[in-house]
């Protein structure tokens, strides 16, 4: 740590995690669209709980034509007090759902089956201490898509609005 000036871009005023729908609930509502042999895999519990704003899940038909998304996320269960472990978990979690942000303006969706995607690279900057087992807001945007590539970036905030990481 070094002393010096400090600032951050403020977190948007959006509904909190208790006002959002869990990814598991979204999946349960669409389970009839999933072939029977894949249903257990589709509904399996993940190590990261995610809660999406209405219409912003990667499984939803994009209603928002702007290249922005927001998701609340946290690790399932209590984690040890090891900052590196929390950073590793956030780095893992921050790659989930990031790609779908650049699809919004084009009405593309994983649910439609008309998308093939992969992360070409992924970088993280950790600004302030945080706990990955507490709710964090992941606000993503996509300033550009061209040549079959979508550029996405994100900001991670604590529930109190402290910017803790950027991707």
Predicted regions and their residues:
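Terminal targeting signals and extreme-terminal segments of soluble enzymes
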Residues: 1-167
């Amino acid at each position: 740590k070094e002393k010096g000036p400090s600032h951050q871009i403020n977190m948007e005023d959006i509904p909190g995690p208790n006002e959002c729908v869990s990814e598991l609930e979204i999946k349960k509502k669409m389970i009839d669209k999933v072939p029977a042999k894949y249903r257990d895999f589709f509904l399996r519990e993940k190590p990261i709980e995610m809660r999406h704003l209405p219409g912003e899940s990667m499984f939803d038909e994009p209603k928002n034509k702007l290249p922005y998304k927001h998701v609340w996320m946290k690790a399932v269960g209590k984690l040890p007090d090891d900052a590196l472990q929390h950073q590793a978990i956030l780095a893992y979690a921050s790659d989930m759902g990031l790609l779908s942000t650049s699809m919004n303006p084009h009405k593309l969706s994983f649910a439609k089956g008309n998308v093939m995607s992969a992360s070409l690279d992924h970088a993280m900057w950790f600004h302030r201490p945080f706990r990955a087992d507490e709710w964090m807001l992941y606000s993503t945007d996509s300033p550009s898509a061209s040549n079959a590539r979508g550029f996405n970036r994100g900001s991670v905030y604590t529930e109190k609005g402290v910017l803790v990481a950027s991707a």
